[in-house]
């Protein structure tokens, strides 16, 4: 099992953003059933956010506090990671000591003492503030025992090294999927491997493109209707999507060859390539979806199959940015 800050976690975590960061929040009963199921299956690395809500922005943490109030015995079984340091309205990163301190204290307040804040990380690195300054502010909370450890999100290899000089880094969260393999080339994977820092892979299905539900332009249109925020992402532009269809077909063919569904293949590629050091955190809002995601653990890719997959996928050019031109500047800083 992977280990984060000395805590044993399952090979697949649980992203909680979708439970609350949408116009219609997931019903509490449904959310609790999902969380209980995930935990019962060993999916105990939970990824939350201080700003993962609409009204209020803190709905994600409020949900967690309610959950652990109802199921207090589960608090010590879950490793809770919380992202913050972000402006609620603009989502701009704020890494200055005052903002970071306010963010951590707010997260602790919202959790109402029902669950320890195991890991806190700023959602993005603030390019206006030296990362050493941000890390010193967070280190104070580790030293006081108010949080257990510090993580990084969307940090470059250089920033990881600089942050580590100030405080131990328990995990680095970054986008990683068959569609977004940047960390294999930009030094992040190598750096984390050398420093034995686990990587938390968000968006392992590339925001839905690798679920098998989006194969045609018509599928894309319906998918965007269900998830309007995707309109702003390059890969969901119809013209860009058309260019990526050959890649999607290659993924589907590989999945079939290895006896897996597309989501199972997407997750097993990450797990196999991580060798116990990369933990994907697919989001779920239902027990059925979590069950489908965790079914990937019943299968695996051999080292030979992994290399075969890489050779096939490397032949295809991937079109479109990870997000869009405006947001790309906030990634891997």
From Swiss-Prot:
GO biological process, one term: pyridoxal biosynthetic process
Gene Ontology CC entries for this record: cytoplasm; nucleus
Active site: 52
Root EC class: oxidoreductase
UniProt keyword NADP, yes or no: yes
Top-level taxon in the UniProt lineage: Eukaryota
Gene Ontology molecular function terms on file: aldo-keto reductase (NADPH) activity; pyridoxine:NADP 4-dehydrogenase activity
Catalyzed reactions: pyridoxine + NADP(+) = pyridoxal + NADPH + H(+)
Pfam family, one: Aldo_ket_red
InterPro entries: Aldo-Keto_reductase, NADP_OxRdtase_dom, NADP_OxRdtase_dom_sf
Compartment(s): Cytoplasm
Keywords: Cytoplasm, NADP, Oxidoreductase
Assigned EC number: 1.1.1.65
Main location: cytoplasm
Keyword flag Secreted: no
Function per UniProt: Catalyzes the reduction of pyridoxal (PL) with NADPH and oxidation of pyridoxine (PN) with NADP(+).
Record-linked PANTHER family: AFLATOXIN B1 ALDEHYDE REDUCTASE, PYRIDOXAL REDUCTASE-RELATED
Family: Belongs to the aldo/keto reductase family.
Protein name: Probable pyridoxal reductase 2
Organism: Schizosaccharomyces pombe (strain 972 / ATCC 24843) (Fission yeast)
